[in-house]
């Protein structure tokens, strides 16, 4: 019935079977089916029969009779259903409209049946049937418009067969399927599809396109009716209707199996063997083929097998062809034995020295030579064969002499050859063999030798003997070179004659050579022929030309031999020629062998060791030393390769032709480690080739920007000062010189960059020697003066000045004289480190000292002054106001110079300079720790501020204090070695703002306690307004009580609002308390950091400063030593909740017990590195921002530990800004840029189609992306993403409803490659979606809360993934999308049916879909207020788009949910989580290690290890690791940033990329980095060098700590409640515009689950207000988390809030509402009170030292940072 339908309805047979794709035709020899399908003429016996059926006579159709090719039926006839094909849909639309098959793609020409659902397939027109010839895919088709007329008008007879492809015949029966497949495969190959047909292993050369897939599918079903297919084919098609390639693959495999006989014959006929594989392997291969044929009842005779084998022999084995050429009784075993013998011989030869070899020449194909010095023809006589094998003349090596061979005894020995010839018959022996170069025989084995006989060699041109016993008239060899047939040298020791005495008394003599390096003594027939002697091998005799028999010859083995009894001995007992002994023929060891045995030692070492008997059982005479000295071992050349020796003085001669300052040498030295950040770590030096003038410049880094600035400076200097132009600069190949920036700089200025060759730094000797000289001088100067190491560059600069002024030994002038400069004025030079006294012309008091000790460094670059180091102030100054200190060579000397004083000489030398001293000083300009004394004078203010210590009153009016002179403790004479650990840049002028000291708050607060310290608020971790260690005011003697009490009478406090409080009278009771920590003042500088005798003053007062409302003093119970404020809870259960219960199990730092008198402040910082114009950044404030300051105590160096070695220096715009004017500048204002930052723009991490596939040079990656591409297309079709029944014209659709589409590609974290077809939702019209719909995902806090609860309750955690989740959600709007690009349908549109990725509404649609399913089918409920968190009585689900995390006490409950999900969605189990051991998860980017009932570790080490190196940030993987993400005291320059437009965009993009990744990591689990991330994120639009440096430092810290994890441990099971705690902190006014930074950390049962650091939205006017703002930000989230915890776990919950602000706690507790200073503050405080009381919230005080939220609000010193974080992240 089906065949009848096919016969009646031809339209259904073709359809779109002819979809076209232009493709290269693959040659048949490259086809994977070359043997199995198309290239075997005997492949199928039925092929001739089928071909004959298709032959036609001329003028008739060449198409075979086919039931499919019949007259068309009316259009009303329904399309047929061709068997089972009709059950399935077809592929996606193809590119046929624009292809060569366009004339079959017209709507009236294409078939459209039920199984062809794609719009690409159409019905043929009833009046115009399909052509009988199918054009190949590469054939150009006619114009689609005129296709109908062409088909109707062109007769079939006129069709050109050469331009068409003959279609296969129709399958007629199931038995003929294998035959039909052969023709079908040929048909596809003729259609240029041969490279996509699989071979029998299923391998293909390339992936087919969808058009080609459609073409194969349709042609297969057109010519192979389903009911005639074999059963196995039907089974494949029922599983996958379009898997035609599997059918072809299995068909080919079956054909291969059925035709194994043919394969074996082909393999046997094509045998080849050249010795590259072992003979055994070859024998096994051949035997296996013959045995397989024998099993198929096909016997292969030995003769036939030998003939086939001999035909394929080559190389050394080709000789066997001649041996077996005439044999009729060849045995296969004998042939294999011969092959094995030759193989073994070659193997032995390859292991020995080339000059030694074994004479098995019957298996060697070597060239033969005979002399041509005589016309005597050498012939052979007939002989009788002694056995079945043909005897042959001995084939020895082809011995030839060189052209330098000298004549001996007036007989000249020449090299000659004879023409090659084959043996003509069995009775003729040729003197030559077929000429063929082969490998030499190196063995000296002579098992086949006949003792005391000479081997008669028909091919040797010379006679060679191994013993000199028979050699007459022997002379040493000097010029003779002998080579064998393989062109290998044979060393010759001596030359002489052999004298023969034959039977009849005939005597003759022939020339002979002596060498011990042959296997046999060779008698040359050519030499005998010269004496008219021939060999008769039939009678085995030597005869004269007249027939006289001279001697018999003996056949031994395969060779003929002559006895040595006919030789006349030379009667020489011992021959001394070349140490050859007659007693024995020495077989010496080849030198290469000994060289390898002795570990590739050199020639001289081996020879000397043998002479000294260092190696036993081996003598020097046992080794062949010829050519040993010139032997080149390949392994030694590779393994011992070294760079060439640099030739001294090899600089190019043309360098001398340059004028001064035209040719420069430059080099960089560094880094110098363990220095302060302000000190340079590198220097770059320049030397002029002509004058040898030298320059040095300090550098803090080696970045290309820094180097470029230096080059700009020196070129400008040379141009302006010397009127010269630099033409050439010679450098090494360091990256700082070879970068594109510097190369472009040189090119633009016409400067030639001359680089050294690779790994030849010695060629850069001028610059290298200068650096070495300068460093030698530096070490010497520092050692002599005793100055600290951070002044190393001052020593280098001093040395440069001196070296430029002195005459070098090779020159007659100094560099200065060569440059045309005057000589050095010695009166302007002081010894390096010379002690001086610097005048302080602006002291604070007239009675204070006017001089400060210092040490002279070098003359100033920018003034007539001198650079002098002041140890007491830890800085250098540029001044002329100094006096040389008499009788002291150096205050820092470690040596005794009592007898070496130079005071008189110095006075005499500097007398002229003394009169020049004035009071005008200038500031040193280059970036080294120097300032003019105008700057430091403001620092020398002895007791300029009122005497206030760390715990004085809240506000002290300095007008009420009378100044009293205090003795100043000077700095020690010797500078401590640890001074290099300090940050030595000076602070600017201090603010005259009165000090307002409060241990908690400097503006507003409640009670004051003398027993507590609050160092947090000491000027927001900047020391700009603090006294630094070592400053004069820190050394004030405070031993007198009267002196302390003086000035404390009648002190009145002043509020910022202008009102004054009553005077605080002097109180003799408890108002003032004194505590003495140490009664003995310390003289040591380091110990001076601790207090000597310091009164601790606590003033209790009801007055509240800073406009805070008046609050009653805390009752006595609140002033307990534990510093805990009672809870503010009205709940009756509050009596069971204590501060200890709240603080219990929190990861707070463990502090060592401190005595009540310990007032050290762990949060103070060392002096900061500042720039002149600053704004707040990482914890610092500008002077204009400072409202109040706090005078802090000094602390020990270990508390002030800072990062010095690795952290980067801040950017200095003055010195490091490029002098070259850019093309266009963009002015960036800091504040405007910060305001412009709305959010961190995500950086694109995906690839476009052209990046992933079209232009991807990584073929392996490209193939994976192509595979992912096809997989995505299949999934889209499977999910019915769009309507495949109809294409819509682009012009007929409203443009608002049209959505652009694109492919994006990316590589997932597990290494898989992903392709996704997405809509361009970013340009989607607002009318096409509901803006109220939201795409919800699980909040990170919800996930962390769920993980924490899972750990505490031993839950199983299961991870699932739903494939193509969005495509399960229908779309309601009428939207159209452009087809995928590979279809080429640019003017067509598809109607969307599913929520394609990228649409605005896709996320919301999917959320509603999965939410409905979870609620209705899985009995889940969504937790109120927490989207995407679902739960029922047993299971909790966290949903993030297509990722699901299941939590349950019972694993079976999770499995039940999975089963339900699989009914509707393609659900994949990523991790079931059933193991009791540690399980590793990758959940939303978090790498989690979880062991139930024990612990959970959260990190991102793998991800960071992969991603951070790709950021192009200069990481330092082997250097010292950073120990903190940033340092206190860093400031961002607030000057407007001038930058090129392109460079600005590039740097903004870089900042977005870096901060984007840092934010992702920080908010996942690295909460300790959030402050730095938030601060730097505000400067994304202000990418100055300083901002980038700070960002790089953050990335470096992330790299150094990438292995850190957030550690959780299971909560104690005895605790019945869940404890949720928020820890709050604020840093007042440390952000731009005086904004405060606030931070909160949230903990559940002692586990940190989240953190937040942000800038306060409103400007706070006091510290307390900032703290209130921080607390008010934490409470809402704390309440929401509380609700979530109660929903997920039904235990009771305790909520706690911890803050280190007592003022905030007092405001929350107080009921006084009258003195709130403004409405906003009052409403904020009132709301805070209501939230605390209404939510059962316990508020407690936490010490600042333990407040881990401190890391969220400010940068901290390393020790403090570690102390606060090491408990919860490590």
Curated annotation (Swiss-Prot):
The lineage of its organism: Eukaryota, Fungi, Dikarya, Ascomycota, Saccharomycotina. Residues 579-636 are annotated as: Integrase-type zinc finger-like. It comes from Saccharomyces cerevisiae (strain ATCC 204508 / S288c). GO terms for molecular function: aspartic-type endopeptidase activity; ATP binding; DNA binding; DNA-directed DNA polymerase activity; RNA binding; RNA-directed DNA polymerase activity; RNA-DNA hybrid ribonuclease activity; zinc ion binding. The keyword Electron transport does not apply. Keywords: Aspartyl protease, ATP-binding, Cytoplasm, DNA integration, DNA recombination, DNA-binding, DNA-directed DNA polymerase, Endonuclease, Hydrolase, Magnesium, Metal-binding, Multifunctional enzyme, Nuclease, Nucleotide-binding, Nucleotidyltransferase, Nucleus, Protease, RNA-binding, RNA-directed DNA polymerase, Transferase, Transposable element, Transposition, Viral release from host cell, Virion maturation, Zinc, Zinc-finger. Mg(2+) 1 binds at residues 667, 732. Residues 1-11, 19-39, 49-60, 399-408, 415-435, 1009-1024, 1065-1082 have a biased composition (Polar residues). The active site is at 457 (for protease activity). A motif (Bipartite nuclear localization signal) lies at residues 1193-1227. This is Transposon Ty2-C Gag-Pol polyprotein. GO terms for cellular component: cytoplasm; nucleus. The capsid protein forms a homotrimer, from which the VLPs are assembled. The protease is a homodimer, whose active site consists of two apposed aspartic acid residues.
């Amino acid at each position: 019935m089906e065949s009848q339908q096919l016969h009646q309805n031809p339209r259904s047979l073709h359809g779109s079977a002819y979809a076209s794709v232009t493709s290269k035709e693959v040659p048949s020899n490259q086809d994977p089916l070359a043997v199995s399908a198309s290239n075997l003429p005997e492949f199928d016996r039925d092929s001739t029969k089928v071909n004959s059926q298709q032959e036609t006579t001329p003028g008739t159709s060449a198409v075979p009779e086919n039931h499919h090719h019949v007259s068309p039926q009316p259009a009303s006839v329904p399309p047929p259903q061709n068997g089972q094909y009709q059950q399935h849909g077809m592929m996606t639309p193809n590119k046929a409209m624009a292809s060569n098959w366009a004339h079959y793609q017209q709507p009236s020409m294409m078939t459209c049946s039920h199984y062809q659902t794609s719009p690409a397939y159409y019905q043929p027109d009833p009046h115009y049937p399909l052509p009988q010839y199918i054009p190949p895919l590469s054939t150009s088709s006619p114009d689609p418009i005129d296709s109908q007329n062409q088909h109707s008008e062109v007769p079939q007879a006129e069709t050109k067969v050469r331009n068409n492809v003959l279609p296969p015949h129709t399958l007629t029966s199931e038995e003929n399927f294998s035959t039909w497949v052969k023709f079908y495969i040929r048909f596809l190959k003729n259609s240029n599809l041969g490279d996509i047909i699989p071979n029998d292993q299923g391998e293909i050369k390339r992936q087919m396109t969808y058009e080609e897939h459609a073409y194969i599918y349709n042609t297969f079903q057109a010519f192979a009716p389903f009911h005639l297919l074999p059963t196995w084919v039907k089974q494949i098609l029922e599983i996958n209707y379009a898997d035609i390639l599997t059918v072809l693959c299995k068909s080919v495999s079956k054909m291969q199996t059925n035709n194994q006989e043919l394969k074996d014959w082909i393999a046997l006929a094509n045998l080849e063997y050249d010795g590259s594989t072992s003979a055994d392997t070859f024998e096994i291969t051949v035997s296996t083929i013959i045995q397989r044929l024998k099993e198929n009842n096909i016997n292969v005779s030995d003769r036939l097998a030998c003939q086939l084998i001999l035909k394929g022999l080559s190389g050394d084995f080709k000789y066997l062809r001649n041996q077996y050429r005439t044999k009729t009784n060849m045995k296969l075993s004998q042939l294999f034995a011969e092959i094995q013998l030759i193989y073994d011989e070659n193997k032995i030869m390859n292991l020995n020295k080339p000059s030694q070899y074994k004479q098995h020449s019957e298996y060697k194909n070597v060239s033969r030579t005979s002399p041509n010095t005589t016309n005597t023809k050498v012939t052979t006589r007939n002989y009788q064969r002694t056995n079945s094998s043909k005897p042959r003349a001995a084939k020895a090596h082809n011995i030839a002499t060189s052209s330098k061979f000298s004549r001996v005894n007036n007989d000249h020995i020449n090299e000659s050859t004879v023409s090659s010839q084959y043996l003509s018959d069995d009775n003729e022996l040729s003197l030559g063999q077929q000429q063929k170069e082969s490998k030499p025989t190196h063995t000296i084995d002579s098992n086949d030798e006949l003792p005391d006989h000479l081997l008669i060699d028909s091919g040797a041109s010379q006679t060679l003997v191994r013993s000199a016993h028979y050699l007459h008239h022997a002379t040493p060899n000097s010029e003779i070179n002998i080579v064998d047939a393989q062109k290998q040298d044979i060393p010759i020791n001596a030359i002489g004659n052999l004298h023969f005495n034959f039977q009849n008394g005939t005597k003759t003599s022939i020339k002979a050579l002596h060498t011990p390096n042959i296997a046999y003594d060779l008698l040359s027939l050519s030499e005998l022929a010269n004496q008219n002697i021939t060999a008769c091998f039939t009678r085995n005799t030597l005869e004269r030309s007249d027939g006289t028999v001279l001697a018999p010859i003996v056949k031994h083995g395969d060779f003929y031999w002559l006895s040595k009894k006919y030789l006349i001995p030379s009667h020489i007992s011992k021959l001394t020629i070349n140490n050859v002994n007659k007693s024995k023929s020495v077989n010496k060891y080849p030198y290469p062998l000994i060289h390898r045995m002795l570990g590739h030692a050199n020639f001289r070492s081996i020879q000397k060791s043998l002479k000294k008997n260092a190696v036993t059982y081996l003598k020097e005479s046992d080794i062949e030393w010829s050519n040993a000295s010139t032997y080149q071992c390949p392994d030694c050349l590779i393994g011992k390769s070294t760079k060439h020796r640099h030739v001294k003085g090899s600089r190019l001669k043309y360098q001398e032709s340059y004028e001064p300052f035209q040719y420069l040498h430059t080099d960089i030295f560094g880094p110098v480690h363990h220095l302060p950040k302000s000190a340079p770590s590198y220097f770059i030096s320049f030397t002029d080739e002509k004058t040898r003038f030298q320059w040095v410049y300090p550098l803090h880094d080696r970045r290309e920007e820094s180097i470029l600035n230096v080059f700009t400076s020196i070129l400008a200097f040379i141009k302006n000062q010397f009127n010269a132009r630099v033409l050439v600069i010679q450098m090494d190949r360091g990256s700082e010189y070879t970068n594109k920036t510097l190369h472009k700089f040189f090119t633009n200025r016409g400067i030639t960059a001359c680089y050294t060759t690779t790994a030849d730094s010695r060629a850069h000797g001028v610059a290298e020697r200068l650096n070495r000289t300068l460093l030698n001088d530096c070490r010497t100067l520092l050692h002599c003066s005793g100055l600290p190491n951070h002044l190393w560059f001052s020593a280098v600069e001093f040395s440069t000045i001196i070296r430029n002024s002195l005459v070098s030994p090779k020159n007659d002038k100094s560099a200065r004289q060569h440059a045309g400069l005057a000589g050095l004025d010695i009166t302007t030079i002081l010894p390096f480190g010379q002690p001086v006294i610097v005048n302080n012309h602006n002291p604070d008091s007239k009675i204070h000292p006017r001089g400060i000790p210092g040490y002279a460094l070098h003359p100033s670059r920018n003034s007539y002054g001198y650079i002098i180091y002041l140890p007491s102030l830890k800085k250098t100054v540029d001044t002329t106001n100094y006096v040389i200190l008499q009788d002291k060579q150096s205050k820092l000397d470690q040596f005794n110079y009592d007898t070496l004083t130079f005071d008189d000489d110095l006075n005499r030398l500097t007398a002229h300079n003394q009169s020049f001293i004035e009071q005008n000083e200038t500031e040193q300009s280059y970036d080294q720790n120097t300032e003019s004394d105008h700057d430091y004078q403001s620092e020398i203010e002895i007791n300029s501020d009122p005497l206030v210590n760390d715990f004085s009153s809240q506000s002290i009016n300095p007008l009420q204090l009378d100044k009293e002179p205090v003795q100043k403790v000077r700095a020690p004479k010797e500078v401590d070695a640890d001074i290099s650990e300090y940050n030595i840049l000076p602070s600017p002028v201090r603010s005259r703002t009165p000090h307002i000291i409060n241990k908690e708050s400097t503006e507003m607060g409640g009670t004051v306690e003398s027993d507590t310290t609050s160092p947090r608020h000491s000027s927001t971790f900047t020391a700009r307004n603090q006294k630094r260690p070592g400053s004069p005011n820190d050394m004030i003697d405070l031993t007198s009580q009267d002196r302390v009490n003086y000035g404390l009478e009648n002190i009145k406090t002043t509020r910022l609002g202008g009102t004054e409080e009553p005077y605080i009278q002097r109180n003799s009771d408890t108002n003032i308390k004194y505590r003495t920590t140490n009664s003995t003042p310390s003289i040591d500088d380091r110990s001076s950091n601790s207090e000597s005798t310091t009164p601790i003053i606590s003033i209790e007062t009801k007055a509240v400063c800073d406009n805070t409302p008046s609050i009653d003093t805390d009752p006595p119970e609140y002033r307990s030593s534990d510093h805990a404020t009672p809870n503010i809870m009205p709940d009756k259960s509050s009596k069971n909740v204590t501060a200890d219960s709240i603080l219990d199990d929190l990861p707070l730092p463990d502090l060592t017990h401190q005595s009540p008198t310990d007032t050290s402040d762990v949060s103070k910082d060392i002096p900061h590195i500042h720039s002149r114009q600053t704004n707040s950044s990482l914890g610092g404030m500008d002077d204009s921002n400072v409202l109040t300051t706090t005078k802090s105590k000094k602390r020990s160096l270990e508390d002030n530990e800072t990062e010095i070695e690795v952290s980067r220096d801040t950017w200095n715009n003055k010195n490091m800004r490029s002098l070259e004017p850019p093309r266009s500048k963009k002015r960036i204002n800091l504040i405007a840029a910060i305001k412009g930052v709305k959010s961190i723009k995500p950086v694109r991490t995906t690839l476009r189609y052209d990046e992933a596939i079209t232009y991807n040079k990584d073929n392996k990656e490209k193939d994976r992306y192509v595979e992912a591409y096809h997989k995505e297309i299949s999934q889209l079709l499977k999910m019915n993403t769009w309507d495949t029944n109809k294409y819509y014209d682009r012009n007929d659709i409203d443009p608002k409803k049209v959505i652009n589409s694109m492919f994006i590609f990316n590589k997932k974290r597990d290494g898989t490659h992903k392709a996704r077809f997405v809509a361009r939702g970013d340009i989607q019209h607002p009318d096409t979606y509901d803006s109220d719909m939201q795409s919800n995902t699980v909040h990170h806090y919800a996930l962390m809360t769920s993980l924490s609860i899972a750990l505490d309750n031993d839950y199983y955690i299961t991870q699932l993934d739903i494939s193509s989740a969005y495509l399960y959600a229908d779309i309601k709007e009428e939207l159209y999308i452009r087809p995928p690009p590979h279809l080429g349908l640019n003017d067509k549109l598809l109607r969307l049916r599913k929520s394609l990725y990228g649409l605005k509404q896709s996320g919301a649609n999917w959320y509603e879909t999965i939410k409905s399913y979870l609620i209705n089918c899985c009995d889940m409920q969504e937790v109120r207020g927490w989207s995407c968190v679902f739960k029922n009585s047993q299971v909790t689900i966290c949903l993030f788009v297509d990722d699901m995390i299941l939590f349950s006490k019972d694993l079976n409950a999770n499995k039940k949910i999975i089963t339900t999900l699989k009914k509707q969605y393609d659900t994949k189990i990523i991790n079931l989580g059933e193991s009791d051991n540690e399980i590793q998860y990758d959940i939303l980017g978090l790498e989690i290690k979880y062991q139930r009932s024990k612990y959970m570790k959260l990190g991102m080490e793998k991800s960071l290890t992969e991603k951070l190196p790709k950021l192009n940030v200069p990481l330092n993987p082997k250097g010292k690791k950073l120990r903190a993400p940033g340092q206190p005291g860093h400031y961002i320059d607030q000057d407007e940033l001038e930058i090129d437009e392109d460079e600005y965009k590039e740097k903004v993009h870089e900042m977005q990329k870096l901060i984007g990744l840092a934010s992702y990591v920080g908010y996942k689990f690295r909460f300790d980095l959030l402050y730095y991330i938030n601060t730097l994120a505000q400067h994304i639009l202000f990418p100055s060098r300083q901002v980038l440096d700070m960002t790089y430092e953050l990335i470096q810290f992330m790299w150094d700590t990438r292995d850190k994890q957030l550690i959780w441990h299971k909560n104690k099971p005895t605790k019945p409640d869940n404890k949720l705690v928020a820890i709050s902190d604020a840093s007042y006014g440390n952000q731009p515009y005086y904004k405060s930074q606030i931070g909160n950390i949230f903990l559940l049962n002692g586990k940190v689950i989240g953190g937040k650091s942000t800038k306060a939205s409103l400007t706070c006017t006091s510290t307390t207000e900032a703290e209130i703002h921080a607390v008010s930000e934490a409470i809402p989230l704390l309440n929401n988390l509380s609700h979530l915890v109660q929903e997920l776990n039904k235990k009771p919950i305790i909520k706690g809030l911890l803050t280190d602000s007592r003022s905030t706690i007092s405001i929350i507790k107080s009921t006084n509402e009258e003195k709130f200073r403004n409405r906003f503050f009052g409403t904020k405080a009132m709301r805070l009170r209501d939230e605390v009381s209404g939510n059962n919230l316990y508020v407690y005080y936490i010490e600042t030292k333990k407040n881990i939220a401190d890391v969220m609000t400010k940068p901290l010193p390393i020790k403090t940072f570690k102390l606060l974080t090491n408990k919860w992240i490590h």
